[in-house]
Amino acid sequence: MTIDNPSAFLKTLPTGSGVYQMQDAQGKVIYVGKARNLQKRVSSYFRRQLDSKTQAMMAQVQSIQTTITRNENEALLLEASFIKQFRPRYNVLLRDDKSYPYLYLATHQKFPRLDFYRGAKKAPGRYFGPYPNAGSVRENLALIQKLFKLRQCSESFFKNRTRPCLQYQIKRCTAPCVGYVNEQEYRRQVEDAILFFEGKNDQVIIKLTERMEVASENLVFEEAAHYRDQIRQLRRLQKQQIITGGKGNIDIIGIAESNGAIGFAILFIRSGRMIGHKPFFPNTPLGTTLQTALVEFIPQYYLSPLRNGDIPERIVTSEPLEDRLWIQRALSSGLNRKLAITDQKRAPYKQWQAMAALNAAQALSQHLAQKNTFALKLEAIQKSLALPNPIARIECFDISHTLGEATVASCVVFGEEGPIKKDYRRFNISGVTPGDDYGALRQALTRRYVRLKEGEGILPDVLLIDGGMGQLRQAAEVLEELQVSGVILTAIAKGPGRKAGLEKLFVWGRREEIHLPADNIAFHLIQQIRDEAHRFAITAHCNRRAKRRVESTLQEIEGIGPKRRQKLLKYFGGLQELQRASIEEIARVPGVSETLAKAIYDACHQHKG
């Protein structure tokens, strides 16, 4: 509803709970808010005394839409949904577009494998986490291997060993592949590892102590020494990682502000152990208070499908949380589980609240420093290439194929803070003569910039092509055909002998090549962007090529017709999951024998990589 007459408009608003959307002259949603009393809350925006941030926003508001909800909890959940849908510029916007990794234990296998895992939890077994990043997973994986010596190798590697691998030599595995440990003893290691993951270190230590005493009585001193070392390591870890006052799953959220920017850090406590932390730097309108940022951050973060159902029993914040009980009730309702939120600085969480806040401040400081560094590098590119305007966004394209097979184009995007990975795109090229790089590039550029011209995204200031003047000419022709203007076209070509540091740069509209010194910071960033486009293209190409070859090989297996092939893919949820499956898992598909399962497994792994 338009607000030409605010007084009349406000009288029409209900006094119950709901959500309001503020829209600009183009009908774009620029802010979403929740309210216990819609009339009272929206009226507050029409008072004389408003802070500068709210004044700037209200100057753009042309209409306000309201949605009535049955209760306050629904209002909070709907607000989070609308923020995710509309991405309003005056809301705090969480930029977290990656699912979280886990440690996966294949407990259904005879000798269970422990490995890194990311994605939907479809495969049978136990999942431990989530961990804040891949580094935390690998660190804990190394720790578990050191303590309990569980195998990490793939099924194909495991079943074809005739002698122990390096992991056995460095005492990170007991070599079940060649029978150096029996199933019963290995299962005991697995059970100990599960207890460790669950935070039941005391139980593990009791078991290990009993085994150490038995080994000593039987004069098996080497085995006793092994158990003694395990016990020492576990006790050392207990001192380092255990939280005073509980062994549950807790997220501790720290928040910090610097020069108008706001950063968060979450400490992840799982089964009483801190398994790592992760920083977040949401898009925050200038003038946003810490309390407002915290109130908007928490629902967005915990209601995201990327959480994959992994919600702690308790959330602890380093700053007071407005509407704490409201948010607690709404999240418990929306997540269908009991959740407690603590914001008071008292034992046993006080030291962890301080640590979370310190981590947030440090991460924010580093983030701002990196942002400033990137801004300086973009400025250096502008000066080095003598470009007329400042650069805020660069897109780079590369083409990858193997003798014309499975051609893929990549587009990577860099901004003032570095890579913008959510805007990366890859294009599977079709209908082009194999090996025709010009044709592939034209197709990718056309597909990309048709969408951008139609308003789906942001045009870059600079378009960088991995190639020479030929590729640059293709880009110029495509943009001219699409009537896209205002984009500077550049290219980076290999130098003599394809040596790094000798590359040539081209700018469309200029005849001369540009050679920058090898130590020039602008040159380093251009190389970095080109290399990232190359990496992204090669990864996509290898995946596409492997998928094609596996699909082709599946068609050649006797007993696998179109219907059974579709049945397999539907059962596992896609080719990637089928490739991950073991022979035993494939044999569980109705109508697939163990012999056929082995043939399928071999076909899936014949062309990996």
Curated annotation (Swiss-Prot):
Residues 202-237 form the UVR domain. One of its GO terms (biological process) is nucleotide-excision repair. Keywords: Cytoplasm, DNA damage, DNA excision, DNA repair, Excision nuclease, SOS response. It comes from the Bacteria. Its main location: cytoplasm. Residues 15-92 form the GIY-YIG domain. The keyword Cytoplasm applies. Pfam families: GIY-YIG, HHH_5, UVR, UvrC_RNaseH, UvrC_RNaseH_dom. It is found in: Cytoplasm. GO terms for cellular component: cytoplasm; excinuclease repair complex. The keyword DNA repair applies. One of its GO terms (molecular function) is excinuclease ABC activity. Belongs to the UvrC family. Interacts with UvrB in an incision complex. The UvrABC repair system catalyzes the recognition and processing of DNA lesions. UvrC both incises the 5' and 3' sides of the lesion. The N-terminal half is responsible for the 3' incision and the C-terminal half is responsible for the 5' incision. PANTHER family: UVRABC SYSTEM PROTEIN C, UVRC/OXIDOREDUCTASE. This is UvrABC system protein C. It comes from Coxiella burnetii (strain RSA 331 / Henzerling II).
